[in-house]
């Protein structure tokens, strides 16, 4: 589990750990990871915290080495959750900033699949956390949007390459309200933020975690290479100026 110390990643970790699974968290925030791991271990859950920047290849090599040395029998699932925003073409996002986001959001998931592909127990499962930003955009989000488009395409590519080894699927969250992970640019502040969604609410981490557990369940092994959008129907809503109460305001 990458990015397992906060937000959606933490929630996913809790779902698996509470069912008795051993979960390895790889997160850049060492202090938060220690806090989360201690809380979960206090509940009797088997959660192990690992620290490092997944943009660094050596971090991934060390992580895989630790997991496999402690569990030589192999693993069952990989959850690629970690990513970050570094802005886009309208602000101070530079070439190196853009590439850094791609290393975290696309290159690291590729490398983890490569490192673990020979070590799955039975038919494994890889779930990549994408975003509705892979398919629609707001201004100045190029670094993050490109990474989420990349992880979505990587999903179906890996599904084909890892046939018989692991199923690979992705989830594209919409507006998810957590302490640290929001696809929207701001927290919901009024009733309209909720009611604009066909589901008339914003999402929460549990909505995503339940879908991840579903995709990792071997009973659902015919689902492969797919992206599941979880956004309360928002991306299906046709929006035009002065239509159904929508109004365009020029920037």
Feature annotation, model-predicted:
Residues 113, 147, 155:
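Active-site helix of classical SDR
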Residues 118, 159-164, 221:
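Alpha-helical segment proximal to the catalytic Tyr-Lys
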Residues 89-90, 94-99, 193:
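Substrate-binding pocket helix/loop in short-chain dehydrogenase/reductase
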Residues 1-24:
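Canonical Rossmann dinucleotide-binding motif of NAD(H)/NADP(H)-dependent dehydrogenases/reductases
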Residues 131:
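Residue(s) in the substrate-gating loop at a strand-loop-helix junction
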Residues 136, 213, 224-251:
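Short C-terminal tail/terminal secondary-structure segment
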Residues 170, 191-223, 230-232:
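C-terminal helical subdomain
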